[in-house]
A protein has these predicted regions:
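Cation-handling catalytic/transport regions enriched in His/Asp/Glu
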Residues: 1-173
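Conserved small/polar residues in nucleotide/adenosyl-binding loops
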Residues: 174-180
Length: 183
């Protein structure tokens, strides 16, 4: 926050960015993140189920499986003419077969790693430098010499958690017994 407020100035007058505009920018950053996250989860779950060997999916059409998933991952039910799978090339021709979830998982790891810097207090240069050194000595230095999970655990001191991503997206953990859908 302080960094942006110190450098953001009007190009003609030199007036600093007002606090209320900073708040608007922050709110805009997370606008529709819930819908975007549902969309990515829809893609990832569809990919995993279509590439699954589970018997519960045997004999079902791919589109039927996707529409069942849509019951919990979309706000608006897909129309009958929706042939989304015909153009979802990532999972059929793009090398992501059963791997589309890695997009969202990368966001989880990134947010969780960044939260360690936040926990060190971004305004505390000494703590941020120490955390940066730890990042350099683990994630950047070890690279592929260990499994990614082991490298992450060495940096973070624990397994990855989704809490930081949920927070950074401006979402909260709430329980809804039944999905709310627009039909």
């Amino acid at each position: 926050k302080n960094t942006l407020l110190n450098i953001a100035k009007h190009w003609e007058t030199g007036e600093k960015l007002p606090e209320e505009d900073y708040i608007k920018l922050c709110k805009n950053r997370t606008f529709n993140c819930g819908i975007a996250t549902l969309r990515q989860l829809h893609f990832a779950i569809t990919d995993l189920r279509l590439h699954s060997n589970k018997s519960e999916y045997k004999g079902k059409e791919a589109d039927q499986i996707r529409r069942e998933i849509a019951q919990n991952t979309t706000v608006i039910e897909p129309i009958d003419e929706d042939k989304f799978l015909c153009c979802f090339s990532h999972i059929f021709a793009g090398g992501y077969s059963a791997g589309y979830y890695s997009y969202k998982w990368a966001e989880v790891l990134s947010a969780d790693a960044f939260s360690m810097f936040e926990e060190a207090n971004l305004e505390n240069t000494k703590n941020v430098k120490a955390t940066g050194k730890r990042f350099k000595d683990t994630v950047l230095s070890l690279g592929g010499s260990l499994s990614p999970l082991e490298v992450f655990k060495l940096f973070r001191g624990r397994e990855p958690k989704t809490d930081s991503l949920i927070k950074h997206l401006g979402l909260s953990l709430i329980h809804i017994s039944e999905p709310t859908r627009l039909r």
